[in-house]
Amino acid sequence: MVPESKVTEIYCMADDFCKEFALQQKKYMIEDKKTRHRNKPNRISDAEIMVILILFHSGGFRCFKHYYKEYVCKHLKHLFPRQVSYNRFVELEKEVLLPMTIFIKKVLLGTCTGISFVDSTPLRVCRNQRILIHKTFEGLAERGKCSMGWFFGFKLHLIINDKGEILNFMFTPGNVDDREPLKQDKFLENIKGKLCADKGYIGQALFENLFLNGIQLVTKVKNNMKNSLMSIADKILLRKRALIETVNDELKNIAQIEHSRHRSFNNFIANSLSAIAAYCFFEKKPAIDVNFVNDGQLSIF
């Protein structure tokens, strides 16, 4: 369980952000003079909703309904005194999707250290036997293939640094090529140095494009490709690529970013974003110890 001091810390960060976000959002809102609005605030604030969603993935729970009714409403009553019913809380989740996304992007993400890892992981929304009768994500989720076989759902594309901190993320349908997000400048914003990936990211055009933008894509060589010279440092970094697999594992097993009980797309996005936010608050993240020795030699890349 998360200690109350940590809950207070998360709430203070979320509340400060929500207040600033509301002020900035109000500047760009278009006023509707034809229709009168009550503008009555919700009983529970956006910051409290965000914190409750984040705590769900930090406590090892697997059923959100049980978590909210049996844990939040009973044991966290003193921290969240203005609680709403479970059905009302589910309705309010969609109202914090935009603040939650910007909160993660602008506050919680780590900084690039010059060594980054990229990978994608499938987010299955149903079993393969139920694909033809699945209706919740009809027109959104797609069939895809990963190292574990075929699946139906979405892909989560992650970039992390050597400290295990998430640098950026993107959700795509399951049939999108892993290399497509790397072709978007917004996904690679503030990413510099070496970017280690698996064989699914091999592509000469992609390598040249990234190299011109200050990013060196480091991948293994396929069996039917000509061998290429690679420095010892790059070979060692490729052996440490399991770091991002560990991050994916924590998102799925400690947090619960993947399950098949979603009833709407908004619920899926709220669950996924809160899982990523919860991981950013983990005190202990998987990391590798990287030390550079200055030998006085000049390296030309």
Protein language model features and the residues they cover:
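Short alpha-helical elements
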Residues: 1-301
